[in-house]
Amino acid sequence: MTEILHVIGQGLRYPCYIILLLLIAVAIIEIGFVIYEAAQRAGSDKANTVELLHNMRGCAPDAIRAMLEEEPFLNRQKLAFSKLLGTADLPEEARIAAAKRMLEAEEDYYRRIVRITDTVAKLGPMFGLLGTLIPLGPGIVALGQGDTATLSQSMSVAFDTTIAGLIAAAVCSVISAIRKRWYAADLSDVETVMEGCLQEMKEAER
């Protein structure tokens, strides 16, 4: 039984190293993506939703659509606003349901992006610990045989894998926190504008 467990443990060594390298690669790629996204956000104005709601007062759906096209929203968000305004001829309940569905689609879009770094943040320490424990077995055996060279090599690999896993997890945790703050603000703006659109379409029916 112990031999089987030993074979399984040592057989996981190289897959564990490969996964750790992949996690580090994902972390590096995500650093590039978040820097690019931060540069885009810094280079564009943020929509003033309060002022926008005031400007939308008493406007027809087509006028609101044209107004939103001039605002610094993402193309995907502008398309959602346009689709919502296109439901002006539907009953109020249908418009509200459509708005909820579009908002859920936005939330799902952001959730998929953050899920990548969240996954790395969870797996990094796990595989780092796994990569630490696997070499310790042969290292302890080498210690019992007086083979300090093998022991030192095993310890070096163990510490390296721990560091790699923790670095990947730390980087992705920070990226996830930054993105969650951005996306929460984006979703709040989208929800506010959609509520304004629904209110103006309701007023237009009277």
Model regions: which residues?
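Hydrophobic alpha-helical transmembrane segments of small proteolipidic membrane proteins, enriched
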Residues: 1-74, 83, 104-186
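Cytosol/matrix-facing juxtamembrane amphipathic
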Residues: 7, 182-206
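Amphipathic alpha-helices that form helix-helix packing interfaces
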Residues: 77-84, 113, 193, 197
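Short, charged cytosolic
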Residues: 82-104
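Short leucine-rich amphipathic alpha-helices used at interfaces
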Residues: 96-97, 102-103, 108-109, 165, ...
